[in-house]
Amino acid sequence: MKIGFVGATGYGGTELVRILSHHPHAEECILYQTSGEGNVYSEGYPHLTGLADLKPIDMNTIKHEIDIMFLAAPPGVSSELTPKLADAWVTVIDLSGDLRIKEPAEYEKWYKRTAAPKAVIQEAVYGLAELNQLAIQQAKLIANPGCFPTAVLLGLAPLAKKKLLDESFVIVDAKTGVSGAGRKASMGTHFSELNDNFKIYKVNEHQHTPEIEQALNEWQPGLGPITFSAHLVPMTRGIMATMYTRLTCDLTADDLHDLYSEFYQDSYFVRVRPKGQYPQTKEVYGSNFCDIGVTLDERTNRVTIVSVIDNLMKGAAGQAVQNFNLMNGWDEETGLTIITPIYA
């Protein structure tokens, strides 16, 4: 299969190229690149020398030579390119936030930019692989979930699907490594600003909030707004989302753990920790796994869920390849199982 990339110079795009360079069904990889045109890709990314010695070509040529396009560009680019690719019958997996929010007005409120055409948004299937497999298998356009929503929704899905979340009490406290801010330098990601520091950002206005609420309300209609806080920590990769909620019925701690274990028993990339154990970001570093720990505080009757992912893998490129596999009828682990966590 011939694969195209837009945005292969960012961290998520680079991960896509890395994974697909050894994917058994990737016959050829072709780049569209707006910066550094004419350069061999691996010259800018020496770690891919011999694996991705690719030269970018123009969009009019690329769209007629590929079977699928991965869009890993900043918000706004996908809104423009997706209709053109659809006209050329190219399957698209979009890693930006352009197609995730179904209501254009809601997108424009949180992203502060014009939404994609509504017909394109409505066609896009939300690519949360473990929860939407059938629709993904039939899709031609995938809206790959955001990094925070992936960690949060996988953590809350077992409760929301059973209508067990307290409608007015869902709190998400999330931490991310600096690669989540992208490759472009800024004052906030400068080493001297970030090192030995820990800060909250986009308080009450993080663009992943409506994406999380949208999915939760599909599973459990009537849920109120959630409280979502994002923090930047001085590490390169990783997300830890700690979620707090109350339940709508009485469960014991054992019942709760059994519910999670059974919910994900057939999900290769979601690993529920034994009761009393909680995951760390290092345990999924460089992999497509999401590890989850869950407990019930019987003193307060509140549930705590801890979910960890690698933001560039399960939170971006890894999940995109998982969706690529599902769309083509292959095992969802194809090309991803050799990428095991790097602990030390």
UniProtKB/Swiss-Prot annotation:
What family does the entry list? Belongs to the NAGSA dehydrogenase family. Type 1 subfamily.
Q: In which pathway does it act?
A: Amino-acid biosynthesis; L-arginine biosynthesis; N(2)-acetyl-L-ornithine from L-glutamate: step 3/4
Q: Which HAMAP family match?
A: ArgC_type1
List locations, semicolon-separated.
Cytoplasm
Per the UniProt entry, what species is this protein from, by scientific name?
A: Bacillus amyloliquefaciens
Per the record, what is one GO cellular component? cytoplasm
One Pfam family cited in the UniProt record for this chain = Semialdhyde_dhC_1
This one is known as N-acetyl-gamma-glutamyl-phosphate reductase
Main EC class the enzyme belongs to: oxidoreductase
Give UniProt keywords alphabetically.
Amino-acid biosynthesis, Arginine biosynthesis, Cytoplasm, NADP, Oxidoreductase
EC? Answer: 1.2.1.38
Q: Where is the active site?
A: 147
Transmembrane annotation, as ranges = none
The catalysed reaction is:
N-acetyl-L-glutamate 5-semialdehyde + phosphate + NADP(+) = N-acetyl-L-glutamyl 5-phosphate + NADPH + H(+)
- What is this protein's function? Catalyzes the NADPH-dependent reduction of N-acetyl-5-glutamyl phosphate to yield N-acetyl-L-glutamate 5-semialdehyde.
Write down the CDD domains for this protein, in alphabetical order: AGPR_1_C, AGPR_1_N
Q: Name one GO biological process term.
A: L-arginine biosynthetic process
Q: Which GO terms describe its molecular function?
A: N-acetyl-gamma-glutamyl-phosphate reductase activity; NAD binding; NADP+ binding
